[in-house]
Amino acid sequence: MATQTDKQTIGRHLEQVPKASNLISWSRNGFIAYIPPIITTTTTTPTTTTTTNNNKSNLLLTYIKNSDGKKWQLASPEPINIKLENNFLPQLSLVSWGSLNTDLAVSDIYGNFYILLAGVGLLDPNHIPSTITTTSTIKTEGNTEKNKDTKQIGNGSGTNGHGDSPINTPSFELTSYNHMEMIYRDIINPDINVAVNPGASIVAFKWLNIEKPQIVNKAATRLAENPTTTSSNSSSSIYGYGINQYQPYGVCHPIPTKQACVALRKNGQFILFYQGEHKVEYHKICCNLTDNISIIEKASIGFNNDKQIIVTAWDSLSNDINVYSIDINWGFLVESAKRQKLDQHYHTPKEAQKPPRLTLKKLHQMKPIQCFKEEDGESQSQSVVPEMGKLKVEELSSIDIISSNPDPKSGLSILITYGSSIIYRYALEKSDSSNTTSGGETSKNPISQAFYNLGVEKKIDWKGDDSSVRLVFKDKLMRRGQIESIINGFLDLSSLIIYKDGTVDVVDTTSKQIVNNSKNNNSVTGDEMELDNNDYPPKLISNLFDQGFQFPKISHKNRLVLAISPTMSSIVYTEIYGETVNLQLKPLERIDNFGTNSHDLYYTSVAFAHRYAFALYTSTCSDDLLLLIQSEINRIKDAVDGDTITRNKLGKQLCDSVIIECHKAINFHLDTITKESLDKLLSNNASLQKLLSLQLILGEFQQSSHFPNNYVVPDIAWIVLNLRSASLGIMFTLSSIYRQVSKKKPSEDTLQDSITRGECIMSIIGNFKWLIDLLVYLNQELLQLIYVKNNFLNNGNTTTSKLTLSNSIVLPLILNKVSRLFLMYAISAMGRTHEILKKLHKDLTEANKLFAPMKESLNRYFSISNNSPITVNLFESYLRECDALLNKEVPQKILTANNSINGNVNGNSGTSTNKPYSALKFEQKLLIKGIDVNDDNDSSTKISNTIIEELSNMILDRYSISISRETKLSELMFYDTDWLNIGINKKEVPSYTIDALRKLIISDSSTSTSLAKGEKLRVCTRCRAVSLVGDVTGLWTMVFQRTCMCGNAWVNV
């Protein structure tokens, strides 16, 4: 009976959660945490009806994954269970990802609060997170300040509530984001046999902002309508891109790498949970909004421009809506933040650790207004006297705060909703004696006007409080739909109104305009939020809605649990009392601007590029955006009349345009890359990484039997990504070895030194093998292309060779500047490492200190190096010759092409400064499209093909002179490079599993089921690369502990 009662209690409390948006949270890392809906089974007998709760987990985690290169889907949900004593799974009521996307806040119906940390593993599984709290508050009401004694509550471990001491401090290791550990618990009600205490439940929650600048891209702006200035998009309008850099705003933890959050319980207790100056543990301080007994039914938390926390709460006992401001004095953390900018390991002495404090002030109090609505759903103005029988009184349904955003002109808005459809918007404004309210009170005078006038007659001048703030009514918004919840968007630049029928309005918080749903039935009544969508192409493209996309319609029977992706490209949803715990995933749908000509494709690509740039600047996962791009490509193919080849060409045209616009949107110019800037691309530049991963996925999606050469595009992206990671690994390892040998003489080497250095060398063995085999494959292609060329010149006929100019990989890799520089850099790094290891081997042998670990690792390295069928130094010299040749020839040929075009247009070749063709277009053609002589969509592509063909013949002739005569043809052509899985002989399903990071075969099965005991795999959610979990501290693979080479997240499997 007790169990059945508890299940009924759980179901009732889940239904009573005021906002279904509290039950799901989508992080910018791409992980979706959600509280599963109640899955019930009803059993009926002649005498009773029994309902059974079938939930086995109370918290689930999922993410979007690339299943086969062409399809995206949600992964099977993984249980992240929150347990109380005796392994009891309480019903959860709140889940929210933090601002840094690694901390997950969770609360249950008993009021217990938990924080989980994603991407870490607990080294001591038996460690239980403790709760250490400090309470310190100053309450201020009006001009009276009441100080309370500081009270410290704790378990004796730590000082001033801070667990920076080694006592009871857990140790973590970094791992994939789908692995989580609980790092904090605030247990209010551990006894599950006690009835739920309604006063302990959390009714409002918010994460604090991060104390660091944020870059966000501006809206794409239409620049011109001049055909002579257009790019390869063949459009008469081109768009320009820019960025905004916002300074930290709102309320932030003073240390940029730390987080804090605030919560309000139903009994009026306000709590600040915050991290200390080091480590990940949380602490808390709290205060009560009032000394009286209160039951807060509806509340919201936000931040204003003065770095204050604003709380608006409705007390059901007094029927008052109260507004409070809360200031945080961060204590010693402010000074620590300054010191850590100079010394990141700075620790504040314990005697100087003054804990944070809260200062509370009541700003305003009012009663809910009487709000009326016509029975048929039409709104009624508050000034109109209601007619009984036609109007009904709407009750207070929700309170929401839209925080001020980084724009200094923005302000905090308090939204009070009645009847789930009528929104009254208020703002907090400082007092001004010149402004009077409709009730006859001045903003600066809280007493009635009559008493104020009496004071003037008595010559008593009351000047008021210059710092006083009043709640000012701004406007009323009428909605035809029933509002489920209102949530803040990224950086509070927008807010989302989610309706009970599943539709969503996106509201710009600065202009107060709805940027989507211009034709939706839920549109605002009146003209408060009108948006002109008749301008096409639009002057500004700031989101996908500007190009005719809209959130999909959802058919459902029960209450929806819905979340919108951070890129606003798709939604996920489920139903309470649904048939499954799995979420449903839907991308945006196109409802307008269905054109498929080259202009329309370009405008669409601008919208996609703007969103992709937003994801890159804000470190947001964009997998859902790729899903939308692929669905749009499929829509275009289905909408066009014609054969399959025509449809696929149109899809490829959009694909290429999206990639090119993404380069432009983040201001990444392939033609400006130099040898000097290559180090930045290797170490800390995510732009190239993200652009290549986009090219990899879209290129893989475009592969079909109608375009057999389409493998070239993803292969080029994959090779350059691997060249980047391999070069980074080699240089990192080379630096580590150099530091080790510079500290000690070879005669002082120990066994531990040998083990450490041996591990460094072994970590790059696979990448050495991959690089050498890649060079071998490139030489194989070059030899075949020379054969094809000579056969055509000598015999005048075509060859039966599968390899041609169009499907070659080696030619675009050498002709393109970026890939050529990466090749040269990787070969140079190999050469330097080879020389150091040769010297090290010699010195250790002479000193009789060549221990077994070093001996084994060096033998494996030299075995790979010595068995190569090519001479690496010779090929490096060839690449340098090609580099010098291309740096000279490419500008000359581009100049000739432009002169030729200008001569054709103007009648002479020297009078125009018009440059329709550029080095950028040439480099983009090679890296993004490869060499496709059949690609002739526009004049720019035809010029590229002509130049590429001429330059290809040059580098093939140079290869014939420099290398081919000194190459052992039989050894080279029969050398096995199939495991690289690139080029014309690529296997769709390899017969083994390769660690993509370390370039080692880890399983003789493509299903990865025959791993060694104790080994675990991680998989990339985007490119599907696999790698072994576990990175030795100090090795280069630590750089990729959480993210793949393509920049997306790993997930442990």
UniProtKB/Swiss-Prot annotation:
Compartments it resides in: Nucleus
Chain intervals with Basic and acidic residues compositional bias: 142-151
Keywords: Activator, Nucleus, Transcription, Transcription regulation
Recorded GO CC terms: mediator complex
Taxonomic superkingdom: Eukaryota
Location (main, coarse): nucleus
Keyword hit for Transcription: yes
An annotated GO BP: positive regulation of DNA-templated transcription
Region (Disordered): 139-170
Protein family per UniProt: Belongs to the Mediator complex subunit 16 family.
Function of the protein: Component of the Mediator complex, a coactivator involved in the regulated transcription of nearly all RNA polymerase II-dependent genes. Mediator functions as a bridge to convey information from gene-specific regulatory proteins to the basal RNA polymerase II transcription machinery. Mediator is recruited to promoters by direct interactions with regulatory proteins and serves as a scaffold for the assembly of a functional preinitiation complex with RNA polymerase II and the general transcription factors.
Quaternary structure annotation from Swiss-Prot or TrEMBL: Component of the Mediator complex.
UniProt name for this protein: Mediator of RNA polymerase II transcription subunit 16
Upper lineage: Eukaryota, Fungi, Dikarya, Ascomycota, Saccharomycotina
